[in-house]
């Protein structure tokens, strides 16, 4: 075991990273060695046991905790580890399998004080809190000391306060850094291995940067960062715009691996550090908070690569060479407590533990923690989003949560996909979670099913049981895109989250998050939220012939640019949507599948969430269909069946008494954007390579197209019918066309209706239902290609290396595929004539209650 470990250690050292944490088998072998240590290995063996085993409810932690408990109880005698040392080591394991033995050891006079010292710093107590409280009540002195320590928040006060002056060396990345730059999609397989994944950060050459990757497209500027650290300070990540794009916490993990410090007793994880950005995207900001980092929005124009600066967080100043070069205000003073606690999640759990202990001891509420500033009183009404969150925190019906209020809304629905799922699994283990408190948690395999690596196959095999054993619902590889499924399981006007930035509920509201916060939401059933402001987009008038919903999606950034609320340039970036909720009105009769196209794209606006005002009829139609789908899932053996049955009953209860929240007429918005549909007479595209760079199609007509992609969560069955009709049986189209339906249900119906024949005739490459090209983590288009795509975003290098990607509708992609270029307005409208004649049958959605095989199967499923 030692020989193999040292070999692995040297291989990783050659890469400049530490070895992997020990797994359960290695820990079992390590324990045998500790019982009979080879000569000269004592210190090494103890170091492995102390520092290289994951905490929480990891399988390896279970083996470690069982061994240490046996030694601490005196059932097993080991020369290297005394009873007291074993108890001390149990106290470093964060929570989970170590907690029960520590509580038992409070009754052992020999080690009770050591056990108490460990429990005082253990936050993940959950129901075990009651066991300690009971011992204290029964007179156990050490249990009383633990309760008092929790009440006094010694877990918090024992940690250093945020320094008044933090000296850092600047690592500046000019322009926009998106999460694809920090955590590239093709390297998604390595995300759970934080140090290894870090090596891919900034691996693609950036012409405007002071650094170069060590191997273009493979390894980022790691040595450059190490050289900056030699100035003797932590490195701060600095950029004009930081963290836009996907919700992946792996982006924050990589930044903090460069800028933070090791977490004691937790292998291969770091916390802390400083990130400075002119704009910091909201989900990235949150994952920074969760990781104990200090994210600061500040003008960075006077900072240069390699500068040594002082960050004065309490004064709100950046000082360079004795001169103040920028001033800032922290998002909230609570950030100081989050950093001190080692992260926002630690702070929330710890504050709750302290409150519980004080209540049990009959003490008043603690005044130790900083509280968020309550917003100013106002008599204004509430927006739809504010009312939804109000209901989720238990306010009286019709009351809402004002912007700026800190709250913890109930998470009714939580989603996890397969490139973030393995990280969410690890975070759930770290949180000692053995069962979900959120009402419904769903796991998908949409990003890796088509072209799995060995590590993906392992995930496909192991993750479903991990999720369903905790009461979640696990999809299967090939089922399709997480969002297209999760939307089918939603309850109106409820709140949720998901480990993917496109978790944007078309009914209700979701606040997508990184894997740490998703794990917290799934485990505890609530999620921390500083209620954002809202921006209202109001459509008016009638859609014009040939104009699609995707064009309305792109109209939002286009009209925001016209109103001065959005700029494409990154320096001094303006984005009125960033960190706010996008609320959409004026299209109340959209089908829910159509509404999702609008809510989904709020991710590209960097909005915190999205609501859409819909009439009851389309929602009733959708939910009636969804009950049949969920019954089919139960019949097909999807687990956890009890969770699906519970959701069916809740949907049926809503349908029996349909009731929708509505915004008050006097609700306040940060901005209101009005879009007159009569003014949109042609498609709107987003130009390479920025989803904010929206233009009318006529401005780019004639651009040669090499490849086209019709797929992603932005599509539904209607788009594929339209594309098949527009291809019109043409052979040998001049463009390489990729087609990927969002779910297996869409695929099945499209095949049945004969549309796959049209794709085949055209020579299209039809992909397994799922994400396909959209994330760029598996298949990609040819290097340097110009592409028209229905995917979510067109960041540089996302669909393929050095590509130029236009975002547009499925209809436009099909027409461009036939012509080999972006059409003129006349060419477009001529082609769309065939669709305009038959919109009712083309844009007909999947109503499972009206599809015979689904309806028949559902009849056989009873509660």
Descriptions of predicted regions:
Residues 2-31, 36, 335-348:
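Amphipathic alpha-helical packing elements
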Residues 24-31, 55-74, 94-106, 125-136:
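Amphipathic alpha-helical scaffolding segments comprising HEAT/armadillo-like alpha-solenoid repeats
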Residues 42, 79-83, 112:
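Residue-level detector of extended alpha-helical repeat arrays and alpha-solenoid scaffolds
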Residues 92, 98, 102, 114-863:
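Fe-S-dependent hydro-lyases/dehydratases of central metabolism
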């Amino acid at each position: 075991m030692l020989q193999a470990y040292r070999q692995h250690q040297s291989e990783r050292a050659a890469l400049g990273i530490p070895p992997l944490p020990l797994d359960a088998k290695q820990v079992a072998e390590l324990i045998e060695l500790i019982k009979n240590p080879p000569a000269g290995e004592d210190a090494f063996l103890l170091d492995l046991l102390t520092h290289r085993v994951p905490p929480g409810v990891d399988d390896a932690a279970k083996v470690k905790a069982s061994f240490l408990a046996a030694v601490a109880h005196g059932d097993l005698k080991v020369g290297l580890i005394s009873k007291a040392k074993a108890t001390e080591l149990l106290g470093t394991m964060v929570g989970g399998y170590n907690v029960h033995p520590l509580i038992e050891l409070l009754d052992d006079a020999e080690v009770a004080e050591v056990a108490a010292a460990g429990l005082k710093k253990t936050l993940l107590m959950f129901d075990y809190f009651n066991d300690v409280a009971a011992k204290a009540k029964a007179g156990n002195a050490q249990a009383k000391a633990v309760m008092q320590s929790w009440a006094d928040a010694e877990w918090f006060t024992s940690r250093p306060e945020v320094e008044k002056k933090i000296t850092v060396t600047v690592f500046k990345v000019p322009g926009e850094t998106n999460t694809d730059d920090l955590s590239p999609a093709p390297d998604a397989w390595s995300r759970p291995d934080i140090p290894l994944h870090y090596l891919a950060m900034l691996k693609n050459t950036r012409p405007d940067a002071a650094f170069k990757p060590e191997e273009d497209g493979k390894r980022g500027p790691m040595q450059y960062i190490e050289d900056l650290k030699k100035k003797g300070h932590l490195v701060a990540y600095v950029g004009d715009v930081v963290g836009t794009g996907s919700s992946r916490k792996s982006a924050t993990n990589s930044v903090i691996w460069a800028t933070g410090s090791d977490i004691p007793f937790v292998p291969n994880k770091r916390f802390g550090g400083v990130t400075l950005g002119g704009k910091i995207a909201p989900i990235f900001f949150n994952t920074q908070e969760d990781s104990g980092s200090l994210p600061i929005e500040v003008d960075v124009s006077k900072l240069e690569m390699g500068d040594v600066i002082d960050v004065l967080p309490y004064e709100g100043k950046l000082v360079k060479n004795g001169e103040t070069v920028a001033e800032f205000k922290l998002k909230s003073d609570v950030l100081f407590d989050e950093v001190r606690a080692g992260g926002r999640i630690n702070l929330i759990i710890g504050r709750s533990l302290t409150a519980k202990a004080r209540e049990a001891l009959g003490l008043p509420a603690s005044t130790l923690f900083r509280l968020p500033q309550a917003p100013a009183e106002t008599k204004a009404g509430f927006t739809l989003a504010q009312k939804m969150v109000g209901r989720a925190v238990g306010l009286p019906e019709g009351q809402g949560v004002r912007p700026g209020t800190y709250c913890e809304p109930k998470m009714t629905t939580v989603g996890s996909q397969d490139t973030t799922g393995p990280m969410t699994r690890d975070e759930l283990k770290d949180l000692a979670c053995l069962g979900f408190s959120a009402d419904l948690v769903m796991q998908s395999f949409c990003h890796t099913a088509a072209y799995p690596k060995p590590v993906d196959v392992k995930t496909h095999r192991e993750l479903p049981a991990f999720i369903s054993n905790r009461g979640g619902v696990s999809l299967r590889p090939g089922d399709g895109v997480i969002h297209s499924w999760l939307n089918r399981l939603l309850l109106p006007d409820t709140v949720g989250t998901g480990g993917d930035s496109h978790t944007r509920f078309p009914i209700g509201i979701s606040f997508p998050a990184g894997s740490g916060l998703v794990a917290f939401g799934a485990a505890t059933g609530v999620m921390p939220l500083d209620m954002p402001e809202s921006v209202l987009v109001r459509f008016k008038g009638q859609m014009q012939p040939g104009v699609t919903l995707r064009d309305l999606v792109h109209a939002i950034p286009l009209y925001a640019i016209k109103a001065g609320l959005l700029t494409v340039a990154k320096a001094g970036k303006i984005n009125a949507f960033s960190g706010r909720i996008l609320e959409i009105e004026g299209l109340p009769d959209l089908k829910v599948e159509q509404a999702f196209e609008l809510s989904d794209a709020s991710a590209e606006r960097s909005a915190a969430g999205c609501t859409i005002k819909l009439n009851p009829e389309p929602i009733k139609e959708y939910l009636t269909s969804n009950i049949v789908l969920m019954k089919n899932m139960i019949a097909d053996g999807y687990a956890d069946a009890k969770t699906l049955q519970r959701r069916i009953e809740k949907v049926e209860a809503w349908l029996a008494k349909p009731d929708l929240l509505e915004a008050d007429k006097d609700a306040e918005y940060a901005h209101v954007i009005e879009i007159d549909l009569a003014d949109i007479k042609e498609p709107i595209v987003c130009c390479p390579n920025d989803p904010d760079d929206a233009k009318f199609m006529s401005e780019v007509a004639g651009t040669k197209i090499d490849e086209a992609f019709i797929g992603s969560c932005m599509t539904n069955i209607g788009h594929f019918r339209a594309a098949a009709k527009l291809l019109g049986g043409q052979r040998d189209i001049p463009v390489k066309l990729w087609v990927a339906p969002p779910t297996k249900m869409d695929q099945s119906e499209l095949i049945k209706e004969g549309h796959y024949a049209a794709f085949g005739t055209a020579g299209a490459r039809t992909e397994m239902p799922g994400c396909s090209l959209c994330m760029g983590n598996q298949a990609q288009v040819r290097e340097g290609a110009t592409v028209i795509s229905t995917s979510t975003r067109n960041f540089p290098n996302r669909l393929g290396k050095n590509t130029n990607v236009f975002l547009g509708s499925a209809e436009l992609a099909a027409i461009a595929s036939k012509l080999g270029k972006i059409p003129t307005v006349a060419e477009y409208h001529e082609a769309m004539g065939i669709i305009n004649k038959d919109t009712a049958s083309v844009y007909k959605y999947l109503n499972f209650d009206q599809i015979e095989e689904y309806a028949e199967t559902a009849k056989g499923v009873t509660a």
